[in-house]
Amino acid sequence: MLILKTVKQLQEFVASAGDEIGFVPTMGALHDGHMSLIKKCVSENAVSIVSTFVNPTQFLPGEDLEKYPKKEESDIKICELCGVSAMFIPDAKEMYFDDEPCIIAPKKYSSILEGKSRPGHFDGVLRVLVKLFNLTRAKRVYMGKKDAQQLVIVQNMVKTLFLNLQVVPCEIVRESDGLALSSRNAYLSEEDKCNALRLSRALINASNLIKGGELDTSEIKTGMLKTLEPLTVDYVAIVDRDFNQISKVELGNTIILVAANVGKTRLIDNIWV
């Protein structure tokens, strides 16, 4: 496996890699959720690239940019074990110079939920991803459903800009107790981890209500909020797969999302129904 630190090194690798390139963009601190993306990428492409870059432009002032988990040595070992062809591990100076953002997330997506709570976040995500997509020339890009709003926004960008790649959505990976895997779980104390399970339990309860015939979104959200007590809830939302608010669950076309603070850590989770 090659370790690439500069844009030039990546460009030289890509130039000789052929057309069957798969790409997994990450911010490092890789866990089993990332591994599921990486393994799928490796199995479906002749050449696989994983980036680990903590992108500063998607963090708001006061967020956890400086303390975001960094585990480069562990990340490299994981990628080697998965059979990755090359890792791209740039620093911020390599990715950004005096350029201004030229890609802006549509207000339809960026003004609600995560976008409302973290204004400018999705602009920063698209800013780095369009660079990485162009650099890797990937045919397929693998992204997790856990960041559902991000996934839909990226799919929209790919469609709008006529980018010649396929965004491959990958299922959420959970601990045995139901907690969705996240690099930010490293911030949680044992007590926090117990409280964090309220997110997945709220989603499971919502799923059970739907299976029982309840399709009214206000009733489902009321039940979820009770399960989430006493957490500080940012939002509970039920939308269609283009992130339009809906009053009735549309089976096969609905995402149920939750964001809440657990201790000092903000967590998100969702299910697709």
UniProtKB/Swiss-Prot annotation:
Its EC number is 6.3.2.1. Transmembrane segments: none annotated. One of its GO terms (biological process) is pantothenate biosynthetic process. It is an enzyme of class 6 (ligase). Keywords: ATP-binding, Cytoplasm, Ligase, Nucleotide-binding, Pantothenate biosynthesis. Catalyzes the condensation of pantoate with beta-alanine in an ATP-dependent reaction via a pantoyl-adenylate intermediate. Belongs to the pantothenate synthetase family. This is Pantothenate synthetase. It comes from Campylobacter curvus (strain 525.92).
